Amino acid sequence: MILDLHTHSIKSDDGRAKVENYCKWIRKKEIPLDGFVLTEHRQYDSESDYRALEDEYNLLILKASEVETDYGHVLVFGVNEDLLHSFDFANIRLPIQTVLNAARENGAFAAPCHPGRKRVGLFSHYELSGPISDVHTVEVFNGGSIPGEDELSVKQAAIHGYKGFGGSDSHVVSRIGYCATTFESDSITTVEGLVGELQSGSFGPISLRPEPKNTTTEP
């Protein structure tokens, strides 16, 4: 089962993609995704209901969050009412330990995203402040990475013994599925099921970026 674990819709302040347009694009371009997770910035969208779109396009659509910490950005899967009351999702300087502890205590799963990125990536903070012992999984493939960032993420994840996953970090329709995560299970249907599979470690990152077009011409 292949899921894009990191996407943004117009619910995020910098997102320009409607969720239905993601679904249409996936089907039009025959992107081999079974679903995607909406990780809106600094919030959890508890109001939106995408079940009709799931049925129409035969895609799993789950909701999570991307929060900002003193060690960079972190994706939180399995957000529930107890977790929402554990810390302020809108705070842009959350202590990462607070997020990791609260996620664990409330049955959620927290993992740093784009860790190879400057300033907002985990590993740039490791250089200054040292590693965090409770981190065990990071996003090693990110569809918005510039050259060198994913390579750094993969290298540092290996050094620290972290499990890696992938996500497109799409903010526009055409970027969805650039990177994703392949799971051994083919029966994820809920966010609780996703959390269970993430906790099991039975997954890996995958790049689905389109091949660059050959602009050379024959003589």
Across the structure, where does each feature detected by a protein language model lie?
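A basic- and aromatic-enriched beta-loop-alpha substructure that forms the phosphate/nucleotide-
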Residues: E66-A90
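Active-site-proximal beta-strand elements of phosphoester/diester hydrolases
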Residues: I2-L5, L75-V76, P112
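Charge-dense polyanion-binding interfaces
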Residues: S187-P210
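An N-terminally biased module of ancient metal coordination in phosphate/nucleic-acid-related enzymes
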Residues: M1-Y71, R93, P147, V172-S174
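Domain-core and long-helix interface of multi-subunit machines
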Residues: T7-D13, Y44-E47, D82-Y178, T182, ...
